[in-house]
Regions:
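DNA polymerase processivity clamps
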Residues: 1-99, 118-233
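Long, charge-dense
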Residues: 103-123
Length: 233
């Protein structure tokens, strides 16, 4: 199977959420981070036919998908091929072979997420505003290689939606305030900046459920993120 630029981008994003990954037959490829706070469902269909051509794999687990992505990015016109016990990334005269791992040894989603029918709000969030939030948190609150400090409090007052970036759940000393548009709903929820940084660069439709769950739907790709919200009661 040849890897398109879109598939390359989606795999890179999946790798950023969790290095454990399970290729699955069908168009829905999912990943969940180790704290269970963000779940990604991407529309990528892989040809799971084994190299022998005699059968099709149902799933193929990889312990560290970041290595596979690095292999893909190092080759021109790369392809992925599956065999019973390994996955190959092929480009020209080069073949990189990665051993498969049983799903029992991987941190991967065990079920799909059903978003609640009842939602408190629905609004659009641009890629530029997400980038603005992330850059502010990095600059003002600091970050490590694996964690970005900060939270985003999103409030609708029946007229406008505003986002406030702050260092902690309760502390709001140094803050960034951004107007996100108009609304006729009243709501209030908080998400971590560390989860926002895992979203693919895109504009989003955001929906919030009072069951402490947000859905971020990409506007240009068939990709959805489910993000847990912080307890601010």
């Amino acid at each position: 199977m040849k890897i398109t630029n879109e598939t390359r981008e989606l795999l890179s994003n999946l790798a950023g959420i969790n290095k454990n990954f399970l290729f699955k037959r069908g168009a829905s490829q999912t990943s969940i981070n180790h704290s269970n706070s963000i779940y990604m469902d991407a529309n990528i269909e892989f040809d799971m036919t084994a190299e022998s051509g005699l059968y099709e794999l149902y799933e193929a687990g990889v312990y560290d998908i970041t290595k596979v992505v690095a292999g893909i990015n190092s080759l021109e016109c790369p392809e992925i091929r599956f065999s019973e016990n390994s996955l190959s990334v092929i480009g020209g005269d080069t073949e990189m072979i990665f051993a498969l791992t049983d799903r029992s040894k991987l941190k991967v989603p065990t079920k799909t997420i059903k978003f609640p029918d009842l939602i408190d709000c629905k609004f659009e969030l641009s890629s530029n505003k997400i980038t603005q939030i992330i850059n502010y948190a990095k600059t003002v609150y600091g970050s490590t290689k694996s964690f970005l400090t900060g939270f985003v409090l999103i409030v609708g007052d029946g007229r406008t939606i505003n986002a406030q970036v702050q260092e902690s759940h309760r502390t709001a000393n140094d803050v960034l305030k951004i107007n996100l548009g108009e609304c006729d709903q009243t709501f209030r929820f908080m998400v971590s900046v560390d989860n926002l940084k895992l979203l693919m660069k895109d504009d989003y439709v955001v929906e919030y459920s009072p069951k402490h769950l947000c859905r971020f739907s990409c506007k240009s790709k068939k990709t959805i993120y489910y993000c847990s919200t912080e307890n601010i009661d």
